[in-house]
Amino acid sequence: AAPGIHNAPDRLRVPLKRVGERGENRWQEISYEQAMDEIAERLKQVVDEYGPEGMAVSTSGWNTQTTQAADRRFMNLLGAPNWISGVSLCAGNTAAINRLTYGWFPMGDFQNTNCIVLFGHNPKKHSWTPIYNMIEGARARGAKVIVLDPRVSEQAEVADVHLRLRSGTDAAMCLGWLKVIFDEELYDKKFVAKWCTGFDELKARVDEYPLERVSAITGVDQALIAEAARVYATADGAIIPWTPITDMQISSTSAIRLHSILRAVTGNLDIVGGETLGGFNPDMI
């Protein structure tokens, strides 16, 4: 499929400018320089006549990975607020909450991690193939895989630990993990002391979720909840890869926030085998 798309005869390879009336399908090849100049002039006309609010931009690229937010920065400089993207339907919560928590969207170090946690995610050989391959590579090295999914998915079938929680109870499960991690002092005390704020308030909130309550909410046995929490917290480098499953469920905001907290309190940020934080290209800002 990819070669067919790449080599398709109707694939756009050079800028084309419409000549004649709309719908006549008459086009003229022009240079990139001319195209950019004419686009800039048209944008200037729109801003001059209607203000920057008269412009809308649609993009399909992830602003944290593909374009380094250059499209958003471009609109910001113009003063245009109308940005449309599939990200708002796919990873909007994740992108916003992670940035608010620790400044950037974390990326898992699959090549060196010793534990992978999949919240409802089911990468397969022919679906999410790059992630699937990285999981398989990590598993071959001996990394543990924890799957949280009501279904017995393909990943769940070969997981080291499978928690068949009720749909939409991810946040409660995370609170249960934190309860085990705090009670057994499995958190990274140095990292928490240096980088985390509100720890006492967090611990007080977590204390409201003993494993009995979490088990009742999620439908998962207390011992299995505790086992999974220990595997994650004691791994020498662990990751919770992003998945759209979390973004598209009940209480997704709370669940994603708790994913962020789990990464932080276990010290799995910016370490080998953990999750790395990038940032904007310094040459762009």
Predicted segments, located by residue:
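Conserved short loop/turn motifs at secondary-structure junctions
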Residues: 56-64, 217-220, 243-251, 282-283
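A glycine-rich, hydrophobic/aromatic-adjacent loop/helix-cap motif
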Residues: 232-285
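Conserved thiamine diphosphate
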Residues: 109-112, 116-122, 198-218
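Scaffold signal of the M16-like zinc-metallopeptidase fold and its non-catalytic homologs
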Residues: 8-12, 179-209
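Flexible, glycine/charged-enriched surface loops at secondary-structure junctions
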Residues: 50-54, 187-192, 239, 270-277
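Short acidic alpha-helix initiation/capping motifs at coil-to-helix transition points
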Residues: 15-16, 65-66, 202-209, 253
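N-terminal export/assembly segments and adjacent metallocofactor-ligating motifs
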Residues: 1-184, 221
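Core structural elements
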Residues: 203-205, 226-237
